[in-house]
Amino acid sequence: MTTEIISFNLGVTSCYFIIGKEIVMIDAGMPNKLQRFKKILSKNKIDPARIKLIVLTHSHFDHCGSASEIRDLTGAKIAIHKSERECVEHDRVLVPKGVNFRGKITQPLIFSFKIPFPKFTPDIFLNNDPYPLSEFGIDGQIIHTPGHTIGSVSVILNSGEAFVGCMAHNGFPFRLKPGLPIYAQDIGAIKENWKVLIDRGTTFVYPGHGKAFPIEVIKNQLKYPSTN
């Protein structure tokens, strides 16, 4: 199956359309971004009804802030890992630690902000088993990749693209160049999950913040930790 990838920003967050027979959207950006989202649809000549699934890589407000409004517009189902259900239905925030110098310095400031977003009940609760995307005409699956948060997930395509949320950063204020995240609940788990993605043939990384980059960046950081 042939797929097309469209990247766009909703606030500081990098979101993506994976276009097959239908469209799967990765992350829903900051709160109050519905009008910008409509402009993105218009610019790319996308019928909102083609978007059938919104995959939330995790429950932080900058990744799920406009999910409820976008679901209302498109009729798409929202999928999130079951361990983060409370975070989007209520007001629980999973706070990761700073894992390098920049992360430790900025973490208290970044996570002192608690921007409200419309709470919602997701339609699909992912577990630790892969969730295939074949019903949308896309050769790929959603897999559980905990580390940034306990319920973080990634979307991997058979063609080598990996949409990883905050398993990687590539943009201000997080990193000035691509690489491993500067915040994580368990950086060891992130590194192990990167090994899984590499073993599964990942060639290109689509992060939750910043532009896509080749997997060689991550391979080098795993091999030479001092470069992180």
Show where each model-derived region lies.
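A general structural detector for well-ordered alpha-helical segments in enzyme core domains, enriched
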Residues: 37-40, 66, 193, 221
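Short acidic-hydrophobic surface loop/beta-edge motif
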Residues: 8, 18, 129-136
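Short, hinge-like loop/turn segments at secondary-structure boundaries
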Residues: 94-99, 181, 223-225
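Residue-level marker for buried hydrophobic side chains located in beta-strands
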Residues: 24-26, 55, 78, 161-163, ...
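Metallo-beta-lactamase
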Residues: 31-32, 117-118, 130, 139-146, ...
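Active-site HxH/HxHxD metal-binding segment of metal-dependent hydrolases
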Residues: 42-125
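Conserved beta-strand hairpin/beta-sheet module of binuclear metal-dependent hydrolase folds
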Residues: 1-44, 154-170
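Short N-terminal helix/helix-N-cap motif within the alpha/beta-hydrolase-1
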Residues: 35, 59, 64-66, 150, ...
